[in-house]
Every structure is written in structure tokens, then in C-alpha cells.
């Protein structure tokens, strides 16, 4: 049987659509919170100085990565914050109620140690029941009354991270100990909060929206901002790819100003407190056959860039140098047999001196959470002291950070971080120096709380690496980044990464591999089905 050209073209198109790379270009925005995002043309990290050049309070201007979604048959446009440290998508309802965070909380956005999401006693008790009494679903009156008593007794507050989930995974709080790290406040600036300035979704105008008959959606942050609403599912278009029946939440009341696209592990979905998980965006992309594996690669770009990208189901070999090295994510909780957050082992950290020698500031395996939602990085006290000493910095109690020589902003020295798998990422010290005033510079590495079991690397470290997140196999692959606008993209099959060699350099990108097929200018696609169908199509045209 002979196929005509139209049929063959249709097969080619179908093959490409089924397993083609799915790329989201995001814009970089800065702000103290999601209520205080920077103007469109301002993507540089910002800090607020008060009360003198040294005796000052610095307000962390966080980093946000914003993507555009079109939701429902009405294609309501929403700009949301991409977050690798949370796992739920939620957007604003068209008629939601905008509320303000308490003034006392808004005034505490500093470098103080935040605990992330604040859970009340009722929620803490529920998490213990989920772990040890999975069949029990009814709360006692005593448990309900307990929520009135806890407030901030167990958990402090602060707005140093931008991850915004309410759950830490099943059993996370079985010992009622505060866990400090990836999570943080969402914002809430007061009466000027319009809530819908970055878009909203009108469920009544979408013919394809279905409301879930489940518990309400609820997220609460350490700075007392929150969002509550309903769960549902609808068609969501991202970068010209439509995901059918994607589960997400619609907020009816919030003190935040923008929704969130969480793409983390399913163990961090807010529904885990109700003993179930669902297919968030990475998992749904795989389930629908849009990508072959729940995997994405992240390119944060340079410190002053206004845009970056995330590539689902594929790797851009032009964006890194050398080889990708894969490390297993670490288990977060002893009670859980799998990781619930993206945490990897770091073996050692060295600081390069001006003479070329190195000073070791960390040795021995230490868990580190990779959180692109955090502008700054947070390490343990002894590591921070060693880093400050190596850079001849002076610790300022009033600032809560090391004051360093501003000449380091132009330094070519690096901090060398060896991850598990013997992969070393070189981080320019200049990326870790923040200008607080004309004559004062701050080290953008802060002290992690002593109650935390892990350190945290934010985007000032992570932008030096090209990182591939494999949610199926709980793996992370890393390589030294190569900053370039060129692309050499390979689709990843169900078996995972097969080609781990980068074609990028510090000045230019490389070329394609011999097994790749040219798909479009500047893009390399490795897809056997596409190659076979394209060969059939070429043969057909030759024969006729």
C-alpha cells in the first residue's frame, strides 16, 4: 500500500507532537514579595538600605520567574510564577477577594530565618494521623480547638524564600520540629493589592472547566499571607502546547498578587495532607504523551538577564560545558521511602584565593536543596564563617550578613562546589556579591537555621549550573553552564539521558551530534520515529 504525501506529513506531525520538546520561556522579575514585583525593565537584584551604611536592615528582593498560561475554552491569560520547590498550580479567580497581610508580618521581611509555610496545630495533628492512622478521617473537637492556640509558637516567620507550598510531605511534622529551608512567604503588601494584575480565570466562561468535589484548596505562608479556593481541571495552554484536563486550584481569596506554577515532586502537593497526590504539570505532560519522561532542564541565564527558559522532556546541549553528571535525590524524611523535595548531596566546597590556592570550607556529605525560588543561598553557620573569613568579610549583626569588599564584584575567583558523583560547579564570587550602597557590599550567602537538616542553594549559585530534574527516577543531572542564545536540543526518551556531553563553551555553543536530525534552525531533535517517517516521506517523493 502506498501512502500519499498528505498522510505521511500527518504521521510526521503526529510523531513530532507526541514527543517534541516543550519549552517555556520565562521572564525574570524581582521584588520583596509577590506583591512587590519590580517594573518590567528592572531584573537586577535589589536591596533596601535603612539607618546608615553599615547599621542597616536589608530587605531581600527575591527572584521570580514568570510564565504565561491560557486557561479554559475562554483562554483567560494568567502570568504565574514558576517554582521548582512547590508542586501545585493555582491562579486567581476573576471575582476573588483581595486581602492584606498583617502589617507586623509585612515589616519583618528581612534576612531573618524564615520557617516557610506556617501550619497550625490542627494541620500538624492531621499530618501525624496521615502517617500513623491512615484510615482515620474524622477530627475530634479537641483537635479543631487546638488550631486556635498555636499561631507562631512552633514556627517563626520571615520572607527569605519564594517557595509557597503548605505541605512538607507525609509525616514531615511527626516530631513537631520546625524545618527551615525551601519554603517562604508569598507577599501581601496591603491595601494596594489588586490580586488580578497578572491575570485571572473566570470558570463560568469556560465550557471545559470541571470543579472537583473535594476539600477546598488552601495555602498559608510564614508571613501570614494565604490563598484559599477550589480545585478543578481544565485545558491549559503553555507555549502553544495545550494540556487537556490539567488539575489546578482557583483562589477565591488571597493576599498574594500572582499565582504559582509549581513543578516539583508530587510529595509536595498540598493534597498529601489528605493522603493522595495527583498529576501536576510535569507528570501530566508525560501521561498525555507530550513528553516521554517527567523531566525538565532549567537555564537561569546570567545574573543580569531578563529571561531564561525551562525545557520539558528535553536537554539543550548547547547550554552546558563538559558532561552532565547524575546524582540521586536524597530522602527527605526517614519515614518516607522516596524524596519529597529536590535535595542532593554536596561533598565539599572550596574557595579560590587571589593567589590561586584554595581554602576548604565544607567537607563531608551535606544535603542541599536546590531552590530556584530563592534569590540568595543559605549554609550552616560554620560554613558561612569559613566563607566570610576566606573573603576577608566582617559579619554585621545588624544586617545579619557578611559585609565584603566591593572589589569582589569584579573578581575572577570562584567558589568550587563538588556535588555527589564528583561533579564540581564553579560559582563566580562576583555572583555572590550584592551592592547595598555605593560603598557597601553584602555577601549573598546567609546563615541557615541550626534547626534545618539541609542547606539551600538559590539562584545566585544555581545559575552557574545547567540542571536537569528527573522526577520519575528522583535524579538531578548537573554540568557547568554555558551562557548562549544558541540551541542544541535533544528529546529524552523513556529510558532517560543517553547523551550527557555538552556542546557549549563559555563563548559559543557547539554543534549537533551525528545521531541527531535537523528539525529547525538552531535546534537539534533526536527522535527515531520522526527520523523514520521523514525518511519514508523523502523516499515517497523520490519514487513518484
Swiss-Prot record:
Supply the Pfam families for this chain: Asp
State the source organism's domain of life. Answer: Eukaryota
Sites binding pepstatin A sit at 83-85, 371-375
**Membrane topology per the record?**
Lipid-anchor; GPI-anchor
Keywords associated with the record:
Aspartyl protease, Cell membrane, Cell wall, Disulfide bond, Glycoprotein, GPI-anchor, Hydrolase, Lipoprotein, Membrane, Protease, Secreted, Signal, Virulence, Zymogen
**Which residues, renumbered to this chain, are glycosylated?**
212, 240, 252, 422, 499
Q: What InterPro entries has UniProt attached to this entry?
A: Aspartic_peptidase_A1 (IPR001461), Aspartic_peptidase_AS (IPR001969), PEPTIDASE_A1 (IPR033121), Peptidase_aspartic_dom_sf (IPR021109), SAP-like (IPR033876)
Give the induction text: Induced by fluconazole. Expression is regulated by growth phase, temperature, and white-opaque switch.
What are the disulfide bonds? Answer: 98-195, 406-441
Give the subcellular location: Cell membrane; Secreted, Cell wall
Active site at: 167, 371
Question: What's a single GO MF annotation on this record?
Answer: aspartic-type endopeptidase activity
Can you state which reaction this protein catalyses? Preferential cleavage at the carboxyl of hydrophobic amino acids, but fails to cleave 15-Leu-|-Tyr-16, 16-Tyr-|-Leu-17 and 24-Phe-|-Phe-25 of insulin B chain. Activates trypsinogen, and degrades keratin
Gene Ontology biological-process entries: proteolysis
Predominantly, its location class is: membrane
Q: What does this protein do?
A: Secreted aspartic peptidases (SAPs) are a group of ten acidic hydrolases considered as key virulence factors. These enzymes supply the fungus with nutrient amino acids as well as are able to degrade the selected host's proteins involved in the immune defense. Moreover, acts toward human hemoglobin though limited proteolysis to generate a variety of antimicrobial hemocidins, enabling to compete with the other microorganisms of the same physiological niche using the microbicidal peptides generated from the host protein.
Q: What is this protein called?
A: Secreted aspartic protease 9
**Species, as recorded:** Candida albicans (Yeast)
Amino acid at each position: 500500500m502506498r501512502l500519499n504525501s498528505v498522510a505521511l506529513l500527518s504521521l510526521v506531525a503526529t510523531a513530532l507532537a507526541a514527543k517534541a520538546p516543550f519549552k517555556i520561556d520565562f521572564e525574570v522579575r524581582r521584588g520583596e514579595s509577590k506583591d512587590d514585583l519590580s517594573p518590567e525593565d528592572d531584573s537586577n537584584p535589589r536591596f533596601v538600605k535603612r539607618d546608615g551604611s553599615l547599621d542597616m536592615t536589608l530587605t531581600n528582593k527575591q527572584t521570580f520567574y514568570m510564565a504565561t498560561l491560557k486557561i479554559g475554552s475562554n483562554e483567560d491569560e494568567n502570568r504565574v510564577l514558576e517554582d521548582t520547590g512547590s508542586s501545585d498550580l493555582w491562579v486567581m479567580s476573576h471575582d476573588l477577594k483581595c486581602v492584606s497581610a498583617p502589617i507586623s508580618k509585612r515589616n519583618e521581611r528581612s534576612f531573618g530565618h524564615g520557617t516557610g509555610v506556617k501550619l497550625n496545630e490542627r494541620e500538624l495533628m492531621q499530618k501525624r494521623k496521615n502517617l500513623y492512622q491512615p484510615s482515620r478521617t474524622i477530627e475530634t473537637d479537641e483537635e479543631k480547638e487546638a488550631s486556635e492556640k498555636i499561631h507562631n509558637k512552633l514556627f517563626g516567620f520571615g520572607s527569605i524564600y519564594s517557595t509557597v507550598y503548605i505541605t512538607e510531605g507525609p509525616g514531615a511534622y511527626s516530631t513537631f520540629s520546625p524545618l527551615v529551608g525551601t519554603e517562604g512567604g508569598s507577599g501581601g503588601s496591603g491595601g494596594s493589592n489588586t490580586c488580578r494584575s497578572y491575570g485571572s480565570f473566570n470558570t463560568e466562561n469556560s465550557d471545559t472547566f470541571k470543579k472537583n468535589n473535594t476539600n477546598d484548596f488552601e495555602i498559608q505562608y510564614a508571613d501570614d499571607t494565604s490563598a484559599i479556593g477550589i480545585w478543578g481541571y481544565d485545558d491549559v495552554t503553555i507555549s502553544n502546547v495545550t494540556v487537556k484536563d490539567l488539575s489546578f486550584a482557583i483562589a477565591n481569596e488571597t493576599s498574594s498578587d500572582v499565582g504559582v506554577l509549581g513543578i516539583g515532586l508530587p510529595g509536595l502537593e498540598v493534597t498529601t495532607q489528605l493522603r493522595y497526590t495527583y498529576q501536576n504539570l510535569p507528570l501530566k505532560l508525560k501521561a498525555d504523551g507530550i513528553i516521554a519522561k517527567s523531566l525538565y532542564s532549567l537555564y537561569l541565564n546570567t545574573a543580569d538577564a531578563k529571561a531564561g527558559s525551562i525545557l520539558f522532556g528535553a536537554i539543550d546541549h548547547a547550554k552546558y560545558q563538559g558532561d552532565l553528571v547524575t546524582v540521586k535525590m536524597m530522602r527527605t524524611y526517614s519515614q518516607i521511602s522516596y524524596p519529597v523535595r529536590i535535595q542532593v548531596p554536596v561533598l565539599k566546597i572550596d574557595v579560590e584565593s587571589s593567589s590561586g590556592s584554595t581554602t576548604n570550607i565544607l567537607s563531608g556529605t551535606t544535603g542541599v536543596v536546590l531552590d530556584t525560588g530563592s534569590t540568595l543561598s543559605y549554609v550552616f553557620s560554620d560554613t558561612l564563617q569559613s566563607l566570610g573569613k576566606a573573603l576577608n568579610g566582617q559579619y554585621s549583626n545588624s544586617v545579619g550578613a557578611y559585609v565584603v569588599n566591593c572589589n569582589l564584584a569584579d573578581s575572577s575567583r570562584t567558589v568550587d562546589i563538588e556535588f555527589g558523583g564528583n561533579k564540581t560547579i564553579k560559582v563566580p564570587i562576583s555572583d555572590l556579591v550584592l551592592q547595598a550602597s555605593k560603598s557597601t557590599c553584602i555577601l549573598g550567602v546567609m546563615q541557615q537555621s541550626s534547626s534545618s537538616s539541609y542547606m539551600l542553594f538559590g539562584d545566585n549559585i544555581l545559575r552557574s549550573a545547567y540542571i536537569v530534574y528527573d522526577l520519575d527516577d528522583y535524579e538531578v543531572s548537573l554540568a557547568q553552564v554555558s551562557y548562549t542564545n544558541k540551541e542544541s536540543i535533544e528529546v529524552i526518551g523513556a529510558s532517560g539521558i543517553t547523551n550527557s556531553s555538552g556542546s557549549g563553551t563559555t563563548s559559543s555553543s557547539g554543534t549537533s551530534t551525528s545521531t541527531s536530525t535537523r528539525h529547525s534552525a538552531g535546534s537539534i531533535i533526536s527522535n527515531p520515529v520522526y527520523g523514520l517517517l521523514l525518511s519514508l516521506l523523502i523516499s515517497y517523493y523520490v519514487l513518484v
